[in-house]
Amino acid sequence: MDSRRAKVIVAALLTTFVLTRSMLSISPNSDFDVAGHNIHHLFTGLLLITACGMPLALFAGRSWLTDIASVGFGAGLALALDEWVYLIATDGSNASYLLPVSLRGGVLMVGFAALYVLVLFLASRGRP
């Protein structure tokens, strides 16, 4: 396992979650609309996961491309997991994003993702 890559993914995951939650708690009615359609950060996250996950899955080694892809993958994962819980547990309104159930769900899912990286790291120790 590339421990540096794991650290970058977890750092991007946690940083993106904290920044997104902070920004949207300050300005909860900030929406990203395209052609009259509200684009939730779940969809932005899925695009980042796809675009950045492919190079990570297909290219071995360490390069500037895999470093950037690691940041994008972690950021996309944070966006998708945070919004996923919010859309399941609430009515999807901007005000509901600020509810404790939404925050707790986001913390739980992002925490599970970071914990999963740690478990994979520990399981890979001693392997070539």
Stretches found by the model and what they are:
Residues 13-27, 53, 75-83:
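Alpha-helical transmembrane segments of multi-pass membrane proteins
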Residues 31-47:
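Loop-to-helix transition at the N-terminal end of transmembrane alpha-helices
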Residues 45-55, 107-120:
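Hydrophobic cores of alpha-helical transmembrane segments in multi-pass inner/ER membrane proteins
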Residues 85-102:
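Interfacial helix-loop-helix junctions of multi-pass membrane proteins
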